[in-house]
Amino acid sequence: MKKTLLGSLILLAFATNAADPQVSTETSGKVTFFGKVVENTCKVKTDSKNMSVVLNDVGKNHLKTKKDTAMPTPFTINLENCSTTTTTNNKPVATKVGAYFYSWKNADENNEYTLKNTKSGNDAAQNVNIQLFDANGTDAIEVVGNGTTDFTHSNTNDVATQQTVNKNHISGKATINGENNVKLHYIARYYATAQAEAGKVESSVDFQIAYE
């Protein structure tokens, strides 16, 4: 009888330890992720994988006030292997392609998600960032940074649902129309975060091909 009771107690203890731990709902939560992989196979051409864009010198009087911009400078990201993909077995195929610009270090969330001037020292310009635009020169690109919240929403009644994001941050979108090569056009400008002080400006941003 004692052996049977001891065995039962051991089994009960094991079952209790094996169960999911009870965590306070006030100090815990869950994040559900949604996404999609498409059949498209665009690649960044070699000449666009590591580019430099040089903006012409500009007088500081062009950048007197916060949000002033100057010296629109075009640049292009070249893609290849973008011929139209035929869907098979109802697999998803995108009809548009663009670039997703992001930087965990340089995106300035306090200044419209422009790119911070990373040049340091006595010869660095002050209060000057770099802002990116789509090819029309009017649609500003918000570089995705740590503070970007457009991809997140709260679930109703604790049910995870896939909703349309506020902004997908796919810039310079071009239609995939059967041509192998696709060009994504953009514009860079100086951007004043306050009254500019003369000096050098330098920054960088990462990008990845994204589909819609």
UniProtKB/Swiss-Prot annotation:
Transmembrane segments: none annotated. It is found in: Fimbrium. It comes from the Bacteria. Residues 1-18 form the signal peptide. Keywords: Disulfide bond, Fimbrium, Signal. Belongs to the fimbrial protein family. This is Major fimbrial subunit. It comes from Haemophilus influenzae.
